[in-house]
Protein backbone atom coordinates (compact mmCIF):
# COMPACT_ATOMS: atom_id res chain seq x y z
CA UNK A 1 0.00 0.00 0.00
CA UNK A 2 1.23 3.50 -0.70
CA UNK A 3 2.07 5.86 2.15
CA UNK A 4 1.08 9.05 0.36
CA UNK A 5 -2.56 8.23 -0.38
CA UNK A 6 -5.29 9.73 1.79
CA UNK A 7 -6.61 7.53 4.57
CA UNK A 8 -9.62 5.38 3.70
CA UNK A 9 -13.01 5.76 5.26
CA UNK A 10 -12.72 3.82 8.53
CA UNK A 11 -16.16 4.60 9.92
CA UNK A 12 -17.87 1.47 11.17
CA UNK A 13 -14.60 -0.45 11.35
CA UNK A 14 -13.05 -1.92 14.49
CA UNK A 15 -9.44 -0.90 15.06
CA UNK A 16 -6.72 -2.91 16.74
CA UNK A 17 -3.54 -1.32 18.02
CA UNK A 18 -0.47 -3.50 17.50
CA UNK A 19 2.59 -2.57 19.62
CA UNK A 20 6.21 -3.70 19.76
CA UNK A 21 6.83 -3.87 16.01
CA UNK A 22 10.26 -3.85 14.43
CA UNK A 23 11.31 -1.11 12.01
CA UNK A 24 11.34 -3.56 9.13
CA UNK A 25 7.74 -4.79 9.58
CA UNK A 26 5.64 -3.56 6.64
CA UNK A 27 1.87 -3.02 6.30
CA UNK A 28 1.68 -5.85 3.77
CA UNK A 29 3.18 -8.25 6.30
CA UNK A 30 0.64 -7.20 8.92
CA UNK A 31 -2.21 -7.52 6.44
CA UNK A 32 -1.20 -11.08 5.52
CA UNK A 33 -0.95 -12.06 9.16
CA UNK A 34 -4.26 -10.52 10.30
CA UNK A 35 -6.33 -11.48 7.25
CA UNK A 36 -6.38 -15.03 8.60
CA UNK A 37 -9.03 -13.95 11.09
CA UNK A 38 -11.30 -11.85 8.89
CA UNK A 39 -11.61 -9.10 6.32
CA UNK A 40 -9.08 -6.31 6.92
CA UNK A 41 -10.14 -2.85 5.81
CA UNK A 42 -6.92 -0.91 6.45
CA UNK A 43 -3.43 -1.23 7.92
CA UNK A 44 -1.67 1.93 9.07
CA UNK A 45 1.88 2.25 10.45
CA UNK A 46 2.71 5.77 11.72
CA UNK A 47 6.14 6.94 10.59
CA UNK A 48 8.48 9.71 11.57
CA UNK A 49 8.25 12.75 9.34
CA UNK A 50 12.00 13.20 8.96
CA UNK A 51 13.45 9.69 9.13
CA UNK A 52 10.42 7.93 7.60
CA UNK A 53 11.00 5.06 10.00
CA UNK A 54 8.28 3.14 11.76
CA UNK A 55 7.36 4.26 15.24
CA UNK A 56 7.02 0.69 16.43
CA UNK A 57 3.23 0.34 16.38
CA UNK A 58 0.42 0.00 13.84
CA UNK A 59 -3.36 -0.02 13.47
CA UNK A 60 -5.27 -2.82 11.80
CA UNK A 61 -8.94 -2.18 10.82
CA UNK A 62 -11.50 -4.95 10.58
CA UNK A 63 -14.93 -4.62 8.99
CA UNK A 64 -16.41 -7.04 11.52
CA UNK A 65 -15.97 -6.57 15.25
CA UNK A 66 -15.99 -10.33 15.87
CA UNK A 67 -13.09 -10.81 13.48
CA UNK A 68 -11.17 -8.08 15.30
CA UNK A 69 -11.79 -9.77 18.66
CA UNK A 70 -10.64 -13.14 17.29
CA UNK A 71 -7.50 -11.55 15.85
CA UNK A 72 -6.76 -9.80 19.15
CA UNK A 73 -7.11 -13.04 21.14
CA UNK A 74 -4.92 -14.95 18.70
CA UNK A 75 -2.19 -12.37 18.00
CA UNK A 76 -1.71 -10.89 21.46
CA UNK A 77 1.60 -12.39 22.58
CA UNK A 78 2.44 -13.83 19.16
CA UNK A 79 5.97 -13.39 17.79
CA UNK A 80 6.48 -11.47 14.53
CA UNK A 81 9.94 -10.63 13.14
CA UNK A 82 11.48 -11.66 16.45
CA UNK A 83 9.22 -9.43 18.57
CA UNK A 84 6.37 -10.40 20.88
CA UNK A 85 3.32 -8.42 19.78
CA UNK A 86 0.93 -6.63 22.10
CA UNK A 87 -2.53 -6.33 20.55
CA UNK A 88 -5.45 -4.43 22.06
CA UNK A 89 -8.57 -2.59 21.05
CA UNK A 90 -7.98 0.99 19.87
CA UNK A 91 -10.04 3.70 21.52
CA UNK A 92 -10.23 6.31 18.81
CA UNK A 93 -10.15 6.47 15.06
CA UNK A 94 -7.17 7.16 12.86
CA UNK A 95 -6.24 10.85 12.54
CA UNK A 96 -5.85 12.36 9.07
CA UNK A 97 -2.37 12.71 7.58
CA UNK A 98 -2.78 16.51 7.52
CA UNK A 99 -2.46 16.45 11.30
CA UNK A 100 1.31 16.12 11.10
CA UNK A 101 1.91 18.03 7.89
CA UNK A 102 3.26 21.60 7.69
CA UNK A 103 3.69 21.72 11.44
CA UNK A 104 6.84 19.77 11.99
CA UNK A 105 6.93 16.44 13.74
CA UNK A 106 3.75 15.27 15.42
CA UNK A 107 3.40 15.68 19.16
CA UNK A 108 4.61 12.89 21.35
CA UNK A 109 1.11 12.11 22.55
CA UNK A 110 0.27 11.05 19.03
CA UNK A 111 2.77 8.19 19.30
CA UNK A 112 0.62 6.17 21.62
CA UNK A 113 -2.10 8.13 20.81
CA UNK A 114 -5.60 8.24 20.43
CA UNK A 115 -5.63 4.66 19.29
CA UNK A 116 -5.43 2.76 22.48
CA UNK A 117 -3.28 3.17 25.46
CA UNK A 118 -1.50 6.46 25.29
CA UNK A 119 2.19 5.75 25.17
CA UNK A 120 4.10 7.73 27.71
CA UNK A 121 6.61 10.23 26.44
CA UNK A 122 10.29 9.61 27.25
CA UNK A 123 10.25 12.49 29.71
CA UNK A 124 7.37 10.95 31.61
CA UNK A 125 9.07 7.59 31.52
CA UNK A 126 12.26 9.12 32.88
CA UNK A 127 10.32 10.90 35.59
CA UNK A 128 8.44 7.75 36.49
CA UNK A 129 11.67 5.77 36.53
CA UNK A 130 13.41 8.37 38.67
CA UNK A 131 10.43 8.46 41.01
CA UNK A 132 10.36 4.68 41.25
CA UNK A 133 14.12 4.65 41.88
CA UNK A 134 13.84 7.32 44.55
CA UNK A 135 10.96 5.44 46.14
CA UNK A 136 12.90 2.18 46.07
CA UNK A 137 15.95 3.98 47.54
CA UNK A 138 13.85 5.57 50.27
CA UNK A 139 12.25 2.21 51.01
CA UNK A 140 15.64 0.50 51.16
CA UNK A 141 16.96 3.29 53.40
CA UNK A 142 13.95 3.02 55.69
CA UNK A 143 14.38 -0.75 55.82
CA UNK A 144 18.10 -0.30 56.55
CA UNK A 145 17.38 2.21 59.31
CA UNK A 146 14.72 -0.10 60.74
CA UNK A 147 17.13 -3.02 60.76
CA UNK A 148 19.78 -0.78 62.38
CA UNK A 149 17.35 0.36 65.08
CA UNK A 150 16.25 -3.22 65.66
CA UNK A 151 19.84 -4.41 65.98
CA UNK A 152 20.58 -1.51 68.36
CA UNK A 153 17.55 -2.32 70.50
CA UNK A 154 18.52 -5.99 70.49
CA UNK A 155 22.10 -5.19 71.51
CA UNK A 156 20.83 -2.84 74.21
CA UNK A 157 18.44 -5.46 75.52
CA UNK A 158 21.23 -8.03 75.47
CA UNK A 159 23.60 -5.68 77.33
CA UNK A 160 20.92 -4.85 79.91
CA UNK A 161 20.15 -8.54 80.38
CA UNK A 162 23.88 -9.27 80.76
CA UNK A 163 24.27 -6.47 83.32
CA UNK A 164 21.22 -7.72 85.20
CA UNK A 165 22.53 -11.28 85.24
CA UNK A 166 25.94 -10.01 86.41
CA UNK A 167 24.28 -8.01 89.17
CA UNK A 168 22.22 -11.02 90.19
CA UNK A 169 25.29 -13.28 90.25
CA UNK A 170 27.20 -10.68 92.29
CA UNK A 171 24.32 -10.32 94.74
CA UNK A 172 24.03 -14.11 95.00
CA UNK A 173 27.77 -14.51 95.64
CA UNK A 174 27.73 -11.72 98.22
CA UNK A 175 24.71 -13.24 99.97
CA UNK A 176 26.37 -16.67 99.96
CA UNK A 177 29.58 -15.23 101.44
CA UNK A 178 27.57 -13.35 104.06
CA UNK A 179 25.64 -16.47 105.01
CA UNK A 180 28.88 -18.44 105.24
CA UNK A 181 30.49 -15.81 107.48
CA UNK A 182 27.37 -15.71 109.67
CA UNK A 183 27.32 -19.49 110.00
CA UNK A 184 31.00 -19.50 110.89
CA UNK A 185 30.51 -16.81 113.53
CA UNK A 186 27.53 -18.68 114.99
CA UNK A 187 29.44 -21.94 115.12
CA UNK A 188 32.32 -20.21 116.85
CA UNK A 189 30.01 -18.61 119.44
CA UNK A 190 28.22 -21.91 120.13
CA UNK A 191 31.36 -24.03 120.55
CA UNK A 192 32.55 -24.24 124.26
CA UNK A 193 35.79 -22.60 125.18
CA UNK A 194 38.75 -24.89 125.04
CA UNK A 195 39.82 -26.42 128.36
CA UNK A 196 43.26 -25.36 129.29
CA UNK A 197 45.36 -28.27 130.49
CA UNK A 198 47.12 -27.55 133.71
CA UNK A 199 50.43 -29.07 134.11
CA UNK A 200 50.71 -31.05 137.38
CA UNK A 201 52.75 -29.33 139.94
CA UNK A 202 55.72 -31.27 140.99
CA UNK A 203 55.52 -32.11 144.63
CA UNK A 204 58.47 -30.64 146.29
CA UNK A 205 59.79 -32.79 149.04
CA UNK A 206 59.99 -30.75 152.16
CA UNK A 207 63.19 -31.39 153.91
CA UNK A 208 62.80 -31.40 157.63
CA UNK A 209 65.19 -29.14 159.41
CA UNK A 210 67.98 -30.79 161.33
CA UNK A 211 67.30 -31.50 164.92
CA UNK A 212 68.88 -29.18 167.37
CA UNK A 213 71.21 -30.63 170.10
CA UNK A 214 68.67 -29.70 172.75
CA UNK A 215 66.04 -31.77 171.14
CA UNK A 216 68.45 -34.65 170.84
CA UNK A 217 69.22 -34.50 174.55
CA UNK A 218 65.63 -34.48 175.57
CA UNK A 219 64.95 -37.47 173.47
CA UNK A 220 67.86 -39.38 174.87
CA UNK A 221 66.92 -38.64 178.49
Curated annotation (Swiss-Prot):
- Amino acid composition bias (Basic residues), ranges on this chain: 117-171, 179-189
Tell whether Ribonucleoprotein is among the UniProt keywords: no
Positions of post-translational Phosphothreonine modification: 22, 25
Q: Which InterPro entries match?
A: Nucleotide-bd_a/b_plait_sf, RBD_domain_sf, RNA-bind/splicing_reg, RRM_dom, RRM_dom_euk
UniProt biased composition (Acidic residues): 212-221
The entry's comment on post-translational modification says: Extensively phosphorylated on serine residues in the RS domain. Phosphorylated by SRPK2 and this causes its redistribution from the nuclear speckle to nucleoplasm and controls cell fate decision in response to cisplatin treatment. KAT5/TIP60 inhibits its phosphorylation by preventing SRPK2 nuclear translocation. Acetylation on Lys-52 by KAT5/TIP60 promotes its proteasomal degradation. This effect is counterbalanced by HDAC6, which positively controls SRSF2 protein level by deacetylating it and preventing its proteasomal degradation.
Where in this protein does the record say Phosphoserine is found? 2, 26, 189, 191, 204, 206, 208, 212, 220
Residues modified to N-acetylserine: 2
Q: Name one GO molecular function term.
A: RNA binding
The function of this protein is:
Necessary for the splicing of pre-mRNA. It is required for formation of the earliest ATP-dependent splicing complex and interacts with spliceosomal components bound to both the 5'- and 3'-splice sites during spliceosome assembly. It also is required for ATP-dependent interactions of both U1 and U2 snRNPs with pre-mRNA. Interacts with other spliceosomal components, via the RS domains, to form a bridge between the 5'- and 3'-splice site binding components, U1 snRNP and U2AF. Binds to purine-rich RNA sequences, either 5'-AGSAGAGTA-3' (S=C or G) or 5'-GTTCGAGTA-3'.
Q: Which family does it belong to?
A: Belongs to the splicing factor SR family.
* Quaternary state and interactors: In vitro, self-associates and binds SRSF1/SFRS1 (ASF/SF2), SNRP70 and U2AF1 but not U2AF2. Binds SREK1/SFRS12. Interacts with CCNL1 and CCNL2. Interacts with SCAF11. Interacts with ZRSR2/U2AF1-RS2. Interacts with CCDC55 (via C-terminus). Interacts with BRDT.
* Name the UniProt record assigns to this protein: Serine/arginine-rich splicing factor 2
Instruction: Give the species this sequence originates from.
Output: Pan troglodytes (Chimpanzee)
